[in-house]
Amino acid sequence: MKHIIPFLICALSIINCQFTTANDTIRILCIGNSFSWDAVEQELAPLCDAGKQPIIIGNLYYGGCSLEQHYTFLLKDTASYSFRYIKDGIRTPHEGYSLRQALLLDQWNYISLQQASHDSGIQSSYEPYLGALIDSVRKYQPQAQLCWMQTWSYSQDAKHPAFPRYQKSQQIMDDSIQSATHALLSHHPELMLIPCGEAIKIARSTKLGDTLCRDGYHLSYEYGRYTASCVWYELLTGKNCRCNPYKNDNMTRQQKRLTQKAAHQALQQAKKY
């Protein structure tokens, strides 16, 4: 029976996919940095394609960009971003883009915000910038669902210069990010949580171990990025990511199974926030 139930869930998911049309295209805009690059630029479009879900992805990239920096860029209308636009699986970069330009480019369904990784567990770094960004984004895109992408802790052996803020402890950084997430959602309950950090934490507790990052903080090309994209895929589509047949050529079947399970479990646990 325990094998039949997951099969039935996936079968129903496949049936639902057959009725998706181009009119159901999901449009997401990430106001981010290299961590949103990891989470949405490589694996999300292929996952959506395999799940028969049309998607348009916009990612505003500025390396190490914090909430404070994003808000400063918006106030000054600074064209400092690299804007990566992904449609039909084709990624087109545009340099010298502003946040205002990206907000006006399309009628976005989802717009995500995030904190720079080095400040992700520092609650005092969030405000007043998060609230100000939310208010500003709403003026441009009042219909969009605003999201919060929870980022992940560093690898245990990370050499990131900000790791000492967390006593060079992955556990302390995880706990700090979780506490900061709880706090921001209590102040901004309208935000939809995208628990990528929780998914990476869960995946690290499996046979995969502490191998989800390629350099101590950016996600691995093989299955780190895949894990984060599975969180996005399931949350945006409502389809169980464990039923998605896609995996990249550098993943094993076991890695696919473990990462999909971690993403799904993270979304179940996110309900406690």
Region annotations inferred by a language model:
Residues 212, 216-225, 229-273:
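Conserved catalytic region of serine esterases and O-acyltransferases that act on ester linkages
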Residues 25-29, 56:
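Residues that mark the start of a beta-strand
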Residues 38-127:
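Conserved SGNH/GDSL esterase-like catalytic core that processes O-acyl groups on lipids
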Residues 12-24:
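Bacterial Sec-dependent signal peptides at the C-terminal "C-region" and cleavage site
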Residues 1-4:
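Positively charged n-region of N-terminal signal peptides that target proteins for export
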Residues 96-221, 234, 243:
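Alpha-helical cap/lid subdomain in secreted, periplasmic
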